[in-house]
A protein has these predicted regions:
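Cellulosome-associated attachment modules in secreted, modular CAZymes
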Residues: 582-633
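Local sequence-structure signature of Cys/Sec-based thiol-disulfide redox active-site neighborhoods
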Residues: 42-61
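Bacterial N-terminal signal peptides
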Residues: 9-18
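Bacterial N-terminal signal peptides that target proteins for export
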Residues: 1-10
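Primarily the internal scaffold of c-type cytochrome electron-transfer domains
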Residues: 23-42, 69-94, 125-512, 517-523, ...
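N-terminal catalytic scaffold of extracellular/periplasmic and nuclease hydrolases
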Residues: 90-107, 117-120
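Conserved, well-structured interaction surfaces
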Residues: 110-122, 126
Length: 633
C-alpha cells in the first residue's frame, strides 16, 4: 500500500468522529456544545501557507542509515513521539473526546499531530483532513527543529555565520508578528501545545559547532533546545474548557470564548510531568547517579533536564557524512525518547503492515530496540527493598525518576505490587496482587496500586449526562479522586499544590520520594517474593474505549490490538525476595514468638499510623486489633 493510500484509509477510519452532534447518552445529556474558540491558545496559529513540514523519513538519508544508537531518525522513528498520530489508543480516545465535547480533538491534535495542526488540517478536532504524509508523522524532525523559544534572551537562537544571508538574531522575526497579534505565550501559558514555530523552513538545534551546513536552508544554534522548558509545551496538559473556582475545584468555563487566562494552572491538571520535574531536586540542583543508569555518556552523571534522561548522550555522529574522526563526538543526543509504553509501537507496525511500516522506517528491528529501551527505562525508574519488621514484611518502592512514578496520562496506566509468600516446599501460602494474564485482570482489589484516578464530576458531569465520578472521559476530566503516585526527590506538598499535583488519598512528607507498604507474614511462610509491575493500558480502559465509542470503529480496533499484543502485558520494574524468620509471623510484632500484651502495647502505640498495620490497608486501626486478638497466644 502506498503512503498516500495508507493515510487515506486511516483517515476514513477516524473521519466519522467529526460528524457527531448532540448525540444522546444513556441516562440523558448530550455532547457539550463547545466551539473552536474554546480551544484557542496563544502561539503560532494554523496556516496552510507556511513552509511545509516535511516527513521524517526524508531526513533518513543523512540521519538514519548508520549507527543504531546515535543516528537520530533511526531511533526516533520507533518512539512514541514519532508514532503519536498513529497510536490506535489515541485514535479511540480522540473519537470519544469529540463525542463528549465538540471540537475537543483540536486540543489533542496540537501535540499528537502538530504538522497537520500547523498546516490547518486539524480544524474541528478530527483527522478527516489528514492527507499529507507528514500528518501522521507525530512529533517529527521538522516540528522540534523549527520550534522557537517564546521568550527572547540568552536561550534565543543565534544564526550560523555560514547562513546566506547571515541572520545573527532570527527569533524576533518570528515573535514580532505574534506579539503584534497578542499571541506570544507568556509565563504559565507555554503548555497545552501552545508552541511557537518558525514559519520558514529552518533548522534549530542545541549545537554551535556543526562544521558544515548540508541543508538548503539556514541553521541556527538554539540553547532553548537543551532545556526542559521546550518539553513543557506538550508535557503539561490541561483540560482547556475548565476553569479554577475560588474553592480550588475546576468547573466548566464559559463556552464560545477562549479561556480567560490561557494559563495551564488555571485549568484542570490532566498531566503535569513538566511541573513535577520543575518542582523537584532535578530542576533545582540536579541529582547524581553514580551507577550511570541515566544519561548515557553524560560528562558528570548529574541529571537535571528532561533531555538528560530521555535523550542520553551517545558517542557517535549526528550525520552519516561525519561518522569518522574528527567529527565523532561524545554527546550526540539519542532520539529514542525512551518512556513507559510497552506495546503500542508494535501495534502501529501491525496496523500499517510490513510493507508500509518499512516504507516509513518502522522496521521490526527498530521496534524491538525501542521496546527494549522503554523496558530498561522502566527498570531504571525505580528501586525496591524488602525488610522484615517483626511479623510484617516491609516493601519500599523508591522513585528514581525526575517526576511522579508513574507520570503522564493517568487513563489505563498503573503500577502495582505482587507479593507472594511461599513455604519451605515452595507452595504459595498467601498472595497479594495476583494477576490473570489470560484476561488482563488484576484479581486482587486490595492490591497496592500506584496511579491517579481522574474523573468527571459536578457541573461537567451534569452537562454531559454522566454520573458523578465517571471514569476515562479525558475531555471532561475535572476532579482528582485519587493520586498516590510516588513523587520525585525534592517534592514538597506546598509546591505541588500550586499546580494541582498534590497527593490525594495518600500522604507523602516533604522530600519523600519513596513509599512503604507493610504486609502481615502468614504462618508457614519462609520466603517472600515481590515484583513491582507496570502496565501501560489496563483492561478497564481498553474496554471503555471499545464500548463507549459510538462514532467509528477505532475503539474496537484499539481493543483488538490490545488483545493481540498480550493485553498490554505487565512489565516487571523490580523483583526481589527475602527469607522470612520463622519466629516473626502474624501479629507477633516484637518477634518474641508469642502474641501477647507486649504486642498489644506496640499496636496501640502505633494507632493511626502504618507501623503496626497487619491487614495491609495502610493504617493501624480496629481491624488490626481484631487480627492481633485472634492470634493471641
Amino acid at each position: 500500500m502506498s503512503g498516500r493510500r495508507a493515510i487515506a484509509s486511516l483517515a476514513l477510519l477516524v473521519a466519522a468522529a467529526g460528524t457527531v452532534s448532540a448525540m444522546p447518552r444513556p441516562g440523558g445529556g448530550a455532547r457539550i456544545p463547545a466551539t473552536s474558540a474554546d480551544f484557542h491558545l496563544p502561539g503560532t496559529q494554523p496556516d496552510p501557507t507556511i513552509d511545509a513540514f516535511l516527513p521524517g523519513v526524508g531526513c533518513s538519508s543523512c540521519h538514519g542509515s548508520y549507527d543504531p544508537n546515535a543516528a537520530p531518525v533511526r531511533t526516533w522513528v520507533a518512539s512514541m513521539m514519532a508514532q503519536s498520530a498513529r497510536d490506535p489508543i489515541w485514535h479511540a480516545s480522540l473519537a470519544i473526546a469529540n463525542q463528549d465535547v465538540a471540537f475537543a480533538g483540536e486540543s489533542c491534535i496540537r501535540c499528537h499531530a502538530p504538522g497537520a495542526w500547523m498546516g490547518g488540517r486539524g480544524a474541528g478536532g478530527t483527522m478527516e483532513n489528514f492527507w499529507l504524509e507528514p500528518d501522521l508523522d507525530g512529533v517529527n524532525c521538522m516540528v522540534c527543529h523549527r520550534m522557537v523559544n517564546p521568550e527572547t534572551g540568552p536561550l534565543s537562537a543565534v544564526g550560523y555565520e555560514t547562513n546566506e544571508p547571515y541572520d545573527p538574531d532570527p527569533d524576533p522575526e518570528v515573535l514580532s508578528p505574534l506579539a503584534a497579534a497578542g499571541l506570544v505565550p507568556g509565563p504559565g501559558q507555554r503548555t497545552n501545545g501552545a508552541y511557537v514555530v518558525d514559519p520558514r523552513d529552518t533548522r534549530r538545534g542545541p549545537f554551535a559547532d556543526i562544521p558544515v551546513n548540508y541543508h538548503s536552508v539556514p541553521m541556527h544554534h538554539s540553547p532553548f533546545h537543551s532545556t526542559s522548558e521546550m518539553c513543557a509545551t506538550c508535557h503539561d496538559v490541561s483540560n482547556v474548557i475548565t476553569v479554577r473556582r475560588p474553592d480550588g475545584s475546576w468547573g466548566l468555563d464559559a463556552l464560545g470564548t477562549p479561556h480567560p487566562t490561557a494559563r495551564g494552572n488555571d485549568m484542570f491538571p490532566e498531566q503535569r510531568t513538566y511541573s513535577e520535574w520543575l518542582n523537584s531536586q532535578f530542576a533545582r540542583e540536579g541529582v547524581p547517579y553514580p551507577d550511570r543508569r541515566f544519561g548515557g555518556n553524560h560528562p558528570t552523571g548529574v541529571m537535571r533536564t528532561c533531555q538528560d534522561c530521555h535523550m542520553p548522550d551517545t558517542q557517535g555522529a549526528g550525520c552519516s557524512l561525519h561518522v569518522n574522526t574528527p567529527y565523532v563526538r561524545p554527546d550526540v543526543p539519542q532520539h529514542g525518547f525512551a518512556g513507559a509504553n510497552s506495546w503500542v509501537v508494535r501495534a502501529v507496525r501491525a496496523q500499517l503492515g510490513p510493507e508500509e511500516a518499512n516504507a516509513v522506517g518502522l522496521l521490526q528491528s527498530r521496534v524491538d530496540a525501542a521496546i527494549a529501551r522503554n523496558l530498561q527505562m522502566l527498570r531504571d525508574a525505580s528501586d525496591m527493598t524488602l525488610s522484615q519488621a517483626g511479623g510484617r514484611l516491609k516493601v519500599r518502592v523508591v522513585n528514581q525518576s525526575g517526576h511522579k512514578l508513574p507520570t503522564g496520562i493517568s487513563e489505563g496506566r498503573r503500577m502495582w505490587l505482587n507479593v507472594r509468600f511461599v513455604s519451605a516446599s515452595g507452595a504459595t501460602v498467601a498472595e497479594s496482587g495476583a494477576y490473570d494474564w489470560a484476561t488482563g485482570t488484576l484479581l486482587d482489589p486490595s492490591a497496592k496500586q500506584y496511579g491517579a484516578h481522574m474523573v468527571t464530576d459536578g457541573e461537567l458531569a451534569e452537562a454531559a449526562g454522566l454520573p458523578d465520578g465517571a471514569d476515562f472521559h479525558i475531555a471532561l476530566l475535572n476532579k482528582v479522586a485519587m493520586d498516590n503516585r510516588i513523587p520525585p526527590r525534592g517534592f514538597t506538598n506546598a509546591s505541588y499544590a500550586e499546580f494541582g499535583g498534590e497527593p490525594v488519598g495518600a500522604s507523602y512528607a516533604d522530600g519523600q520520594h519513596w513509599d512503604d507498604t507493610l504486609y502481615p507474614i502468614p504462618p508457614g511462610a519462609t520466603r517472600a517474593i515481590v515484583t513491582l509491575w507496570h502496565q501501560t493500558t489496563t483492561r478497564e480502559y481498553a474496554e471503555f474505549l471499545r464500548d463507549e465509542n459510538r462514532t467509528d470503529q477505532t475503539g474496537q480496533v484499539a481493543y483488538d490490538l490490545w488483545v493481540q499484543f498480550g493485553r498490554s502485558a505487565p512489565v516487571s520494574m523490580d523483583t526481589a525476595s527475602i527469607d522470612i524468620s520463622p519466629a516473626c509471623t502474624g501479629a507477633d510484632l516484637n518477634c518474641d514468638g508469642a502474641v501477647d500484651g507486649n504486642d498489644l502495647g506496640i499496636l496501640l502505640g502505633a494507632w493511626g499510623t502504618p507501623s503496626a498495620d497487619l491487614d495491609g490497608d495502610g493504617t493501624t486501626d480496629g481491624n488490626d486489633l481484631g487480627i492481633l486478638l485472634g492470634d493471641w497466644g
